[in-house]
């Protein structure tokens, strides 16, 4: 049926072309009626049939929303039509013989086939948009534990702070909760920390009373303030990158006024995503002497707490969800299976794809900056955190002008993409970060699949992003799926133009994990792909409705369907099929 329609369409267009170009030149033809531009006239100028062409007509792009390869064919054929029109119109009347008619017939047949391809592309793109709209509404984030107390939580005195979770080069993190129940207030009073009292010094060792301690669903990150001054506006200006993943409610306290007064072109506000940390509250307060401070970070304390301290008396506090551990800690005690490790890598790619879509580059991806929360079945859910080194400037996007060596290129030098680490400053030099975080995910994949990170360590085994060659990359274990092995090598290509984007890489793993039967077909067409997507949509909606708690794989399928783009999906499918054909 499709071939019959294509032939019919081709004959119709060929007949129109013959009538158009073999007629007598002049203002009229045929029975003396004014010339009406038929379909061929529009094709000769690259227009759709029936589209007005004239000085007052608005131009319309061909193949809008269709894959690039179809638009290329359409534009190429339109150019060929224009050349043929010039060639045959310039001939005397009757100059078009049987050969010319055959050329036009073949030309019209080609147009009919391309029209059929375009119709398939339009149907596929429309179906992807409809599926995306459904799952964008269904794909809900984790609930905000402070949502019921919208105007609370903007003072340090309102929190009960527990033991230290960890510290980095610029902050310390503590577990915390907001006591509201009577039993929690009794526990808070037993260690001398009732809401509203706000003691500056918390006795060390009291947090070890585990039997009395309540659950700590929150984590408070206390930034170390060495050079930002003590005013809220100065702290906000210096540490604004930490607020990129903050919700709007997080800035409703004292920072609301400061954020309102800030000039345009500052750091972006990142939209929420399940694989990206969310800051629930952000506020400034006096620096307290928290448990272990004198041993872990005495030099950054203010002089009133430590005579040799260099810190200011006021700093920034960020309230977030308390996760079980970091990715480094999780991998130290667990060895995920190859399939689970592939799903973990996929989660990082989903988070990075969201950052790129929002115009944000993390620039400090490492296993210490990825948090892990196991689901009910013990499967890890990964969340990207610590945006202190991110690039989130509305003025430059992901293209950072690199005019001098004083421009900050990011945080982690070991996992810095080659296009970043080898960049040289100049008047027009620009660093493109659009695929830099995807490269870092490729390096982290070695750790997730159970091997040492090749860009860490010492000696000859360590690779440097500035100078490594792709042939030097160690091979992943044979137990790792071949598609995942090939993807890791592709993500670590030195040439960023040959590297897949995070969105295409994520789609590729989605197809590899869930679309085995569909991609096994030798003749993969858009209609078959859409049929598979509709089946996945129905199954995912049913699983999401029946399960009390979403498992990791169900949540990943919902993310995949909520980010459907036909162009990126087609690229991933073609790339995956080519890899499988080469095996």
Q: Where are each of the predicted segments found?
A:
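Non-catalytic localization/regulatory regions flanking kinase domains
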Residues: 1-262, 516-583
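Conserved C-lobe activation region of Hanks-type protein kinase-like domains
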Residues: 243, 420-479
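Conserved structural core of kinase catalytic domains
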Residues: 271, 278-334
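Catalytic-loop of the protein kinase fold
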Residues: 356-374
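Activation segment/activation loop of eukaryotic-type protein kinase catalytic domains
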Residues: 368-414, 426
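Conserved C-terminal C-lobe helix
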Residues: 479-493
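Terminal C-lobe "cap" of eukaryotic-type protein kinase domains
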Residues: 493-519
């Amino acid at each position: 049926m499709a071939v019959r329609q294509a032939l019919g369409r081709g004959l119709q267009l060929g007949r129109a072309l013959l009538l158009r170009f073999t007629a007598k030149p002049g203002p009229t033809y045929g029975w003396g009626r004014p010339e009406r531009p038929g379909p061929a006239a529009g094709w000769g100028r690259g227009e759709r049939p029936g589209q007005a062409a004239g000085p007052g007509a608005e131009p319309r792009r061909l193949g809008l929303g269709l894959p690039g390869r179809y638009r290329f064919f359409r534009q190429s054929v339109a150019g060929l039509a224009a050349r043929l029109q010039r060639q045959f119109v310039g001939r005397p009347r009757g100059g078009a013989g049987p050969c010319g008619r055959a050329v036009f017939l073949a030309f019209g047949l080609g147009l009919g086939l391309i029209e059929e391809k375009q119709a398939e592309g339009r149907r596929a793109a429309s179906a992807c948009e409809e599926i995306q709209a459904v799952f964008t509404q269904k794909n809900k984030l984790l609930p905000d534990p402070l949502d019921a107390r919208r105007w609370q939580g903007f003072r340090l005195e309102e929190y009960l702070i527990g033991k230290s979770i960890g510290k980095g080069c610029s902050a310390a993190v503590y577990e915390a909760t907001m006591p509201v129940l009577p039993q929690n207030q009794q526990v808070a009073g037993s260690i001398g920390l009732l809401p509203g009292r706000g003691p500056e010094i918390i006795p060390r060792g009291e947090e070890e009373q585990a039997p009395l301690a309540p659950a700590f669903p929150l984590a408070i990150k206390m930034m170390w303030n060495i050079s930002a001054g003590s005013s809220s506006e100065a702290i906000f200006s210096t540490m604004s990158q930490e607020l990129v993943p903050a919700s709007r409610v997080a800035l409703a306290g004292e920072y609301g006024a400061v954020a309102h007064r800030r000039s345009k072109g500052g750091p972006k506000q990142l939209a929420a995503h399940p694989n990206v940390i969310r800051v629930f509250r952000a506020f400034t307060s006096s620096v307290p002497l928290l448990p272990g401070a004198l041993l872990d970070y005495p030099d950054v304390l203010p002089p009133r707490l430590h005579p040799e301290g260099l810190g200011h008396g006021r700093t920034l506090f960020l309230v977030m969800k308390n996760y079980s551990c970091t990715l480094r800690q999780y991998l130290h005690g667990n060895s995920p299976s190859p399939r689970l490790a592939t799903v973990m890598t996929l989660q990082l790619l989903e988070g990075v794809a969201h950052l790129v879509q929002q115009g944000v580059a993390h620039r400090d991806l490492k296993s210490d900056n990825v948090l892990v929360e196991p689901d009910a079945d013990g499967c890890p859910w990964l969340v990207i955190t610590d945006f202190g080194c991110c690039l989130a400037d509305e003025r430059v996007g992901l293209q950072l002008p690199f005019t001098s060596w004083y421009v900050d290129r990011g945080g982690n030098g070991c996992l810095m993409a080659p296009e970043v680490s080898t960049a040289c400053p100049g008047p027009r030099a620009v660093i493109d970060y659009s695929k830099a975080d995807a490269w870092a995910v490729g390096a982290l994949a070695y750790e997730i699949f159970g091997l040492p990170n090749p860009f860490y360590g010492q000696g000859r085994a360590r690779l440097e992003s500035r100078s490594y060659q792709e042939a030097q990359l160690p091979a992943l274990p044979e137990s790792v799926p071949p598609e995942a092995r090939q993807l890791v090598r592709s993500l670590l290509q030195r040439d960023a133009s040959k590297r897949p984007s995070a969105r295409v890489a994520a789609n590729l793993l989605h197809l590899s994990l869930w679309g085995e039967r569909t991609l096994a077909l030798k003749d993969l067409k858009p209609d078959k792909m859409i049929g598979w997507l509709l089946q996945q949509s129905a199954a995912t909606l049913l699983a999401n409705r029946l399960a009390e708690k979403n498992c990791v794989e169900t949540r990943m399928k919902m993310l995949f369907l909520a980010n459907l783009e036909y162009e990126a999906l087609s690229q991933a499918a073609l790339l995956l099929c080519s890899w499988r054909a080469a095996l």
